[in-house]
């Protein structure tokens, strides 16, 4: 259950409506997901978050699929169910197959396990890793 009302297009402040228009234009779709509809209560936060996301997830050294898979891995680590589903769908839309998803899950699971072991054991960082 949402802790805020998910705003419809008709309920948007003009500043939020402008951000929604940019999301639609950038993504080439009329669909606006619930995350943006929740953030629309604060048009400045909505605009700032969208601007940052466009830069981070835009063209760069990593492929769009890899970026979505990384976003998915972090979403799993943080236990964000909405984000897990959203970024799984986005990664699949950018070419991720079942085998890649399963390999990603194995990596996320292994990293979580060994991270907890290292933290619990207080293993000191090896000097060569500090470069």
Segments from the language model and where they lie:
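Hydrophobic alpha-helical segments
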Residues: 1-131
């Amino acid at each position: 259950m949402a802790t805020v009302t998910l705003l419809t297009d008709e309920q948007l402040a003009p500043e939020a409506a402008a951000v929604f228009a940019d999301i639609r234009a950038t993504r080439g779709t009329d669909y606006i997901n619930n995350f943006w509809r929740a953030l629309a209560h604060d048009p400045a936060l909505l605009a700032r978050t969208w601007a940052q996301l466009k830069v981070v997830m835009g063209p760069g050294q990593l492929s769009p699929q890899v970026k979505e898979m990384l976003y998915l891995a972090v979403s799993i680590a943080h236990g964000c169910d909405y984000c897990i589903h959203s970024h799984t769908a986005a990664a699949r839309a950018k070419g991720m197959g079942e085998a890649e998803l399963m390999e990603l899950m194995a990596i996320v699971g292994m990293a979580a396990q060994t991270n907890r072991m290292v933290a619990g054991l207080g293993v000191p960082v090896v000097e060569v890793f500090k470069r």
